[in-house]
């Protein structure tokens, strides 16, 4: 009897130890996350963005029009299509970058920023995006400058410009170590953790809206993603250049419709955003427990999760572009943040704040879903599920290439 109970005792002990280890790991990750976002990353991201803005002469402001003209002006011209087989057109490279940038962060991330940081978080999201445009400009220029040809294709990114750009400054060994550390971190963050988050969001949204089992959604995702990924960067770019404009236009159109439906809320909404950016208590009341610190933290954090400025992911796409000068692709890169954060993320914020969905007590994507249901009764959940599926799926294939 005593010997027969041993396996059950063993299983129980393993379960308890596993539970304790999970609790310890969760607490450790939470503590590290708090230190990073409270004391380091916010200041680093804003500081670096401010530095590049001043040092480079605010290219995101002075060259914004030129950037749009460069990317979209020759979109249908023969010149844009006659790029070498080893590279992508400027628009294709931007489409791949945006396909990765526009994901669940544009839907659930913005909702989290508003519920955890108040309406004022949107102001700080805008500010971090504007400053981040200069950071991503620098990333794309460096990716172009230090790219190499491998198997007949241009490849590049932080691993390359860290190795080749920093070797004269810090030595080859130190540069290779930093390059390797970055590469491993990126593979883990995008290839494993990030894509798991995106696919889980798709499965949950589809299950909730159409009652399709998550397992079936997961299998379908794996099949479709595999068919695209197996074709390499050219097939990924070919899909992205058509899907990205379509999904962005549809989503922004939804926001425009909601603007008209709730037009009487527009002025109070913007008033709340700007007042709550510096004094959240004036809008939410002291009982909400949200101060300026939370507004800044969640606004900047959600902005980064969405536009990836300074993250080192999108330069992999920008390195492949066929342009005459690296600065051209730098301008294309900050156009990506303009579209991702200042247009698509702002669309989500407007949808949530105009419908007062942020006051419901819900969190994450459920807030955005409630907003869509209020704005489009009867099919709001289904509409959002389709949009979220496009957003997250293109992020999966984009992140696979980056990782």
Name each region found by the language model.
Residues 9-104, 114-120, 132:
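N-terminal alpha-helical transmembrane segments of multi-pass membrane transport
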Residues 52-53, 128-154, 163-228, 387-396:
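Helix-loop-helix module between adjacent transmembrane segments
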Residues 44-48, 55-68, 178, 182, ...:
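Membrane-interface loop-to-helix entry segments
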Residues 79-115, 142-145, 151-165, 181-187, ...:
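Alpha-helical membrane segments and immediately flanking helix-loop junctions
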Residues 241, 247-314, 319, 370:
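Membrane-embedded translocation segments of transport machinery
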Residues 137-151, 254-272, 280-287, 320-323, ...:
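Extracellular/periplasmic helix-exit of transmembrane alpha-helices
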Residues 131-139, 219-233, 244-264, 297, ...:
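Selective recognition of specific alpha-helical transmembrane segments in multi-pass small-molecule
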Residues 59-88, 112-121, 134-173, 358-375, ...:
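Flexible loop linkers connecting adjacent transmembrane helices
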């Amino acid at each position: 009897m005593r010997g027969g109970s041993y396996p059950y005792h063993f299983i129980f002990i393993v379960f308890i130890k596993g539970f304790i280890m999970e609790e310890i790991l969760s607490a450790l990750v939470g503590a590290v996350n708090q230190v990073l976002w409270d004391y380091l990353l916010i200041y680093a991201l804003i500081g670096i963005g401010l530095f590049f803005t001043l040092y480079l002469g605010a290219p995101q402001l002075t060259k914004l029009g030129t950037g749009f003209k460069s990317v979209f002006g020759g979109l249908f011209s023969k010149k844009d299509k006659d790029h070498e087989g080893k590279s992508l057109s400027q628009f294709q490279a931007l489409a791949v970058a945006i396909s990765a940038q526009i994901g669940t962060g544009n839907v659930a991330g913005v909702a989290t920023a508003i519920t955890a940081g108040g309406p004022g978080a949107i102001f700080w999201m805008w500010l971090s995006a504007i400053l981040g445009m200069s950071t991503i400009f620098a990333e794309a220029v460096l990716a172009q400058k230090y790219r190499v040809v491998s198997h007949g294709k241009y490849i590049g990114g932080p691993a390359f410009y860290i190795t080749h750009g920093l070797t004269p400054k810090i030595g080859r060994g130190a540069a290779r170590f930093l390059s390797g550390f970055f590469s491993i971190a990126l593979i883990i963050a995008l290839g494993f953790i990030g894509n798991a988050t995106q696919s889980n969001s798709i499965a949950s949204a589809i299950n909730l809206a159409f009652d399709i089992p998550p397992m079936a959604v997961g299998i379908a995702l794996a099949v479709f993603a595999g068919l695209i990924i197996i074709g390499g960067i050219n097939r990924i770019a070919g899909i992205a250049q058509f899907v990205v404009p379509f999904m962005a236009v549809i989503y922004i159109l939804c926001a425009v419709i909601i603007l008209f439906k709730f037009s009487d809320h527009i002025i109070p909404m913007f008033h709340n955003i700007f007042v709550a950016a510096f004094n959240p208590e004036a809008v939410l009341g002291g009982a909400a427990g949200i101060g300026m610190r939370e507004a800044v933290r969640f606004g900047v954090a959600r902005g980064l999760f969405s536009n990836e400025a300074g993250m080192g992911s999108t330069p992999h796409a920008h390195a492949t572009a066929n342009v005459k000068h690296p600065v051209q692709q730098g301008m294309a890169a900050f156009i990506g943040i303009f579209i991702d954060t200042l247009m698509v993320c702002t669309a989500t914020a407007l949808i949530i704040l105009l419908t007062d969905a942020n006051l419901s007590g819900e969190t994450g994507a459920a807030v955005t879903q409630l907003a869509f249901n209020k704005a489009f009764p009867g099919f709001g959940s289904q509409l959002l599920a389709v949009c979220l599926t496009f957003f997250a799926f293109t992020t999966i294939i984009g992140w696979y290439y980056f990782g």
